[in-house]
């Protein structure tokens, strides 16, 4: 299946984009607020990522209008995003302070801190685990859509989504299974296997509800409370099944079962994500990108992780390979923005009403956590967009082995994202970390300068 066929199968070719009128009925007021996390690995090659249009030092704050930049002002890695300049917010100088403060392998920490802002703890050997939820699951806890959240993985990658106990949320890595889950009724009214399963699910859940009602009078108060908790879970599942059976949206065609290139698989999942958002099936999605191959990048022999990512700070060949690596993901991110920005909605586009966050588990392939490469797009309902915002490194965070000066803790960005989605929170993850002078860095509250 070629690229054009994939686009057609997903309903994303020219003239066949999802339109809001084809989605679930919304209130006559403002459109839904949505958020998508696009998470990749191995940090970045900072000198080939950062923007310094005026030749500014890394030691000063910067606030620049991205639409004023020339093509030459864009860095090699971020150049594919130039066409979306007016809707981007490039954040430079944020840090995973939880990972800086933790006392084990920096690589195994980043994925656990990325969306939680938490202090990761080593489990299963050395792999990090947070003690609380990621921001997407904080938002999902109050979601009323058929799916509270969706988590997709392309080429794998460590989990970045966690429940309120710090347990990893599993990814869906099969686009066909993802489609069947979104559209159990199939397309064109066909009586598909998925639709038959959905009907059976409804019957089973109805029988379970009857069983609960019959048992409840026979139980003690303590057991009845436990049973009612299970009944509520079943009721939630029943509502989800019913909602999916009654989706008032033309489902996209089922995708094929093979993808010649990772870019095709990524585009397939992006199409599913846009369809889910457009149809009102969820407002919260994570797309996790895993490790790319040498062949895809045209890289010389060697291990992407150990030979190139680790050496990109001081080896020109490794830096070139990893620049290509992160540029590839920038191109995929730009394509996701193209899809969202191509759908008219409420006097703007779907991108205007969606916050899309490209973030990473690390800041560099050598396992640093300062100067995190974070790019946001859309979200003009909450943020003053079209800007490069640099936070100078003014806070020396005390780690177990060294001191790292940071601009702002990324916990504050997580708070800002939650607030933008309509939640009232004062902190996400850690509330403070130690500074080298014995005082503490406050990690609570929203990130300044976003509005």
Model-predicted segments: where are they?
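Ligand-binding pockets and gating/stacking loops
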Residues: 1-451
């Amino acid at each position: 299946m070629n690229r054009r066929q994939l686009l057609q199968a997903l309903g994303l070719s020219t003239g066949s984009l999802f339109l809001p009128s084809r989605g679930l009925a919304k209130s006559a007021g403002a459109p839904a607020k949505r958020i998508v996390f696009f998470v990749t690995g191995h940090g970045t090659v900072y000198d080939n990522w950062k923007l310094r249009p005026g030749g500014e030092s890394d030691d000063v704050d910067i606030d620049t209008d991205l639409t004023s930049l020339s093509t030459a002002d864009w860095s090699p890695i971020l150049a594919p995003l130039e066409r979306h300049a007016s809707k981007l917010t490039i954040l430079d100088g944020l840090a995973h302070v939880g990972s800086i403060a933790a006392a084990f392998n920096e690589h195994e920490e980043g994925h656990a801190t990325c969306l939680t802002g938490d202090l990761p703890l080593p489990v299963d050997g050395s792999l990090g685990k947070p003690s609380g939820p990621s921001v997407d699951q904080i938002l999902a806890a109050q979601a009323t859509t058929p799916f509270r959240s969706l988590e997709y993985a392309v080429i794998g990658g460590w989990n970045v989504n966690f429940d309120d106990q710090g347990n990893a949320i599993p990814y869906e890595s099969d686009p066909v299974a993802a489609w069947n889950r979104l559209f159990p009724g199939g397309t064109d009214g066909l009586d598909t296997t998925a639709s038959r399963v959905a009907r059976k699910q409804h019957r089973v859940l109805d029988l379970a509800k009857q069983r609960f009602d019959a048992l409840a009078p026979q139980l003690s108060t303590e057991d009845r409370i436990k049973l009612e908790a299970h009944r509520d879970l079943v009721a939630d599942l029943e509502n989800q099944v019913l909602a999916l059976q009654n989706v008032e949206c033309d489902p996209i065609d089922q995708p094929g079962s093979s993808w010649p290139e990772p870019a095709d698989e990524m585009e397939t999942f992006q199409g599913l994500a846009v369809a889910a958002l457009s149809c009102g099936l969820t407002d919260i999605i994570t797309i996790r990108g895993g490790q790319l191959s040498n062949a895809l990048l045209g890289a010389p022999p060697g291990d992407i992780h150990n030979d190139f990512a680790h050496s990109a700070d001081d080896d020109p060949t490794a830096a070139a390979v990893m620049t290509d690596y992160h540029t590839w993901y920038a191109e995929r991110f730009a394509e996701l923005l193209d899809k969202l920005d191509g759908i008219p909605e409420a006097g703007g586009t779907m991108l205007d009403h969606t916050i899309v966050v490209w973030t990473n588990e690390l800041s560099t392939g050598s396992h640093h956590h300062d100067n995190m490469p974070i790019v946001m797009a859309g979200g003009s309902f909450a943020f003053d967009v079209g800007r490069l915002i640099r936070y100078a490194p003014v806070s020396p965070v005390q780690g177990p082995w060294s001191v790292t000066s940071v601009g702002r803790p990324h916990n504050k960005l997580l708070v800002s994202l939650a607030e933008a989605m309509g939640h009232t929170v004062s902190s996400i993850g850690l509330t403070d970390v130690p500074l080298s002078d014995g005082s503490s860095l406050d990690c609570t509250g929203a990130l300044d300068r976003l509005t």
